[in-house]
């Protein structure tokens, strides 16, 4: 019943199945007609889902950089010149074991395995570091998805607001895309409430101020057509997306970037 109530609230933002144009004040034309054009700098910020983990402690499931690989491939195919930025060492630092396979394409080999995804982190931890990350990476886009590890705690929504506040203060020209976070494999009311606050309160507040902040709905990517959570889209049917789930996420991020920052036509 709670899930049904969530789904009855109309989305006001971008999602993969029906991407609507971003507000005109957020749209820009991107001139990238030759190799000398400046790459679009993209900072992916979040927890283990941003790093690309699966619920797979023995790493028997191949590691494919989570949504970041699919996003990179889509951007490249569309003609964008991009550079992912960030300094997280995960998952290669061995904190949760090291992937056994060699992903293909290997984003490390082409200098694109750059992000700020940190396994187990919550909004408070990201808040402590976001100033440093923005100052160092100087992003054009910030893809922010954080909160699954503390959505049930009262400070989470306020922390998220403070994170976005710090980003727009330090880098007002950057586009900040705040994700409504993915669910766990079983419905959790606190996540539904957290996402509602992102969609209906946080993002509209920043938009009224003229900030380049919008949202995407990553939650719906993990649902069945009837609106219930799809366990088959989770690795080991637990909490992290599997390859199909991550691909859906990649498409949603791509749709947002393309809508906000379309390539100029020749």
Would you name each region that the model predicts?
Residues 41-46, 50-51, 82-87, 140-150, ...:
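Structural recognition of the beta-strand scaffold that forms the well-ordered cores
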Residues 107-110, 115-118, 182-266:
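Catalytic His-Asp segment of secreted/periplasmic serine-dependent ester chemistry enzymes
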Residues 52-159, 187-196:
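Conserved SGNH/GDSL esterase-like catalytic core that processes O-acyl groups on lipids
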Residues 50, 54, 72, 76-80, ...:
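Sec-exported extracytoplasmic/periplasmic mature domains
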Residues 1-89, 127, 261-266:
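N-terminal secretory targeting modules
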Residues 66-70, 156-206, 253:
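Extracytoplasmic, non-cytosolic globular domains
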Residues 125-126, 139-141, 146-152, 159-167, ...:
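Extracellular low-complexity, Gly/Ser/Thr-rich intrinsically disordered linkers
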